[in-house]
A protein has these predicted regions:
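C-terminal catalytic domains of large/alpha subunits in multi-subunit enzymes
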Residues: 1-108
């Protein structure tokens, strides 16, 4: 379903997908499948989706549902990282280096 795909996309964006570009040319240096990290099947845990559809919403017909989980998933992972470390990491993906840099900056 769209919701599962969006959740996987959100996890990928928050934890895996790191586009690296050459600072001089702006060209992506990891644009090939062998160097651009995507989550594999074993990287994504069980996803459980509960949909609440009031009758009042069904009367409107078909509405988009694929986009919201992309945003909310990244926010949830961001909150989990902050809860675990005590600091906000300002940039996706949350690589170990970015998390450690944010922790060092917070210490001053």
């Amino acid at each position: 379903s769209q919701v599962y795909g969006a959740l996987i996309m959100s996890i990928a964006g928050a934890l895996f997908e790191h586009r690296i570009n050459d600072p001089k040319t702006g060209v992506f240096v990891n644009s090939q499948m062998d160097s651009y990290r995507l989550p594999r099947l074993g990287d994504i845990g069980e996803l459980i989706v509960h949909l609440h559809e009031p009758e009042s919403e069904r009367a409107r017909g078909v509405i988009g549902l694929g986009e919201p989980p992309v945003i909310s998933g990244c926010a949830a992972i961001s909150n989990a990282v902050c809860n675990a470390t005590g600091v906000r990491v300002p940039t996706l993906p949350f690589t170990p280096k970015r998390v450690l840099d944010a922790m060092r900056t917070a210490k001053g």
